[in-house]
């Protein structure tokens, strides 16, 4: 009975160690994945901001030129 308890305790101990090592490795893999996702989201936001900024400036430029042309021709 005593040797059975020792064997079971040893198996439990080894199983706990291997489980903790697997969890550490999995957590390390998950951390790397989060960094990649964050980079991907940042790049997407950056690209969208550039696109919106260019379009807004282009529209503002057109509106400004139309307004100046209107004032120059006294058609406003």
Swiss-Prot record:
The disulfide bridges present are 70-76
Signal peptide residues are 1-22
A GO cellular component term found in this entry reads: extracellular region
Tissue expression remark: Expressed by the skin glands.
Q: Which Pfam family is one of those matched by this entry?
A: FSAP_sig_propep
Keyword set, alphabetical order: Amphibian defense peptide, Antimicrobial, Cleavage on pair of basic residues, Disulfide bond, Secreted, Signal
Q: Which family does it belong to?
A: Belongs to the frog skin active peptide (FSAP) family. Esculentin subfamily.
> Protein name, please?
Esculentin-2MT3
